[in-house]
Amino acid sequence: METFNSLFMVSPLLLGVLFFVAMLAGFIDSIAGGGGLLTIPALMAAGMSPANALATNKLQACGGSISATIYFIRRKVVSLSDQKLNIAMTFVGSMSGALLVQYVQADVLRQILPILVICIGLYFLLMPKLGEEDRQRRMYGLPFALIAGGCVGFYDGFFGPAAGSFYALAFVTLCGFNLAKATAHAKLLNATSNIGGLLLFILGGKVIWATGFVMLVGQFLGARMGSRLVLSKGQKLIRPMIVIVSAVMSAKLLYDSHGQEILHWLGMN
């Protein structure tokens, strides 16, 4: 048992719980993003340090995003050849963000991110026709790659929460993709930025590999189930999921940043 605990950093029971948490997170993440809301707190609750939890989370997240990407490529929803520039810019952006976060505090992002996530949820809620079908494309080539790949990729490497929603929003608003197609392409760039960020964590020696790989399998399975629903249900499923996940994520981010003030204001502290 001591050997098991030293290898996985958690007990067998907790490892089983983490596997199913990762599966659920992969399912949610493949549809609307936000799976890290489940996995990062779960890893920290299991006793990992914040650094180990973030690094191991990035490893297991690769399982879900890669699983979804493979599914969408095989269904010919996503073409790798058409996304080469976006992939390259996303990789560079995520590596840059992951490198910078080691030297710069992300406090400013923690303050403004809840507002941005709320705006995403409201955007999809108040524009019910958005993403129902393909529309005229507004941006091509390098400009789009810099915004969707470089900027969002940098954000994903630097901070991360809701990156999948930002990718999907870029494909809907700038490329004119329908919501299902945008979600599929978002997973490709999400997988790219996950890999880029993971490489930096590997160099830092913070990844708990055994636990991460077990969760990666759970993520892979959950994301495969979610990806099938994306193509079969389309925007009827994706839109409400994005709105719900955005609301939950905003609430959690606000609580993480201002939990004591909120409790005091409610008279609970």
Swiss-Prot record:
One of its GO terms (biological process) is response to heat. It is a multi-pass membrane protein. It is found in: Cell inner membrane. Keywords: Cell inner membrane, Cell membrane, Membrane, Transmembrane, Transmembrane helix, Transport. Its main location: membrane. It comes from Escherichia coli (strain K12). GO terms for cellular component: plasma membrane. Residues 1-7, 52-84, 133-156, 219-269 are periplasmic. It comes from the Bacteria. Pfam families: TauE. The keyword Cell membrane applies. The gene is yfcA. NCBIfam families: PRK10621.1. Belongs to the 4-toluene sulfonate uptake permease (TSUP) (TC 2.A.102) family. The chain crosses the membrane at residues 8-28, 31-51, 85-105, 112-132, 157-177, 198-218. This is Probable membrane transporter protein YfcA. InterPro entries: TM_pro_TauE-like (IPR002781), TSUP (IPR052017). Residues 29-30, 106-111, 178-197 are cytoplasmic.
